[in-house]
Amino acid sequence: GLAGHGGCVVAGKQTAGRGRRGRSFYSPEEAGLYLSVILKPRGSLKESLLLTAEAAVAVYKAVLRITGISLGIKWVNDLYYNEKKVCGILTELEWEAESGEFSCVIIGAGINVSQDEADFGPEVAPIAISLAQALGTAPDRTWPPG
């Protein structure tokens, strides 16, 4: 289940996607890849804070491998193409009240896969882009690719 280390939930749609500082994250049905991974890292809280950067690098490598697109990483949680956002990453810590220590880390990522400009709407279109827009065609959503 999701409660175990390395558990992952993947969704084709989010109804309440959110980013940092409670901002909303536009997540239309079957247009993106939305996922959450639970980790129970050993080590200090300081080391766990690096997980957001490590997640950004993992998304960067996956997108490069699958599409050939080299994204830019905006420290520490966003990936961009031509100065427009392709992916947002949110990391949250769960705390145990009794011990005052964190029990797990949940890393969520939302990747814009097949939206076009009209899908984003007038407010989001100037600042967001999908992999399909960057490629000029919708990427293959099957795994393994090819």
Predicted regions located by residue number:
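General beta-strand structural signal in soluble alpha/beta enzymes
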Residues: 11, 71-75
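Residue-level signal for inorganic ion chemistry
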Residues: 35, 78, 110
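N-terminal lobe of the biotin/lipoate ligase/transferase fold
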Residues: 1-66, 87
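Long, positively charged amphipathic alpha-helical accessory segments at protein N-termini or as interdomain linkers
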Residues: 45-46, 50-71, 81-146
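Intrinsically disordered, low-complexity boundary segments flanking structured domains
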Residues: 20-25, 76-77, 117-120
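Acidic, glycine-rich active-site loops and adjacent beta-strand->loop/helix elements
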Residues: 15, 77-79
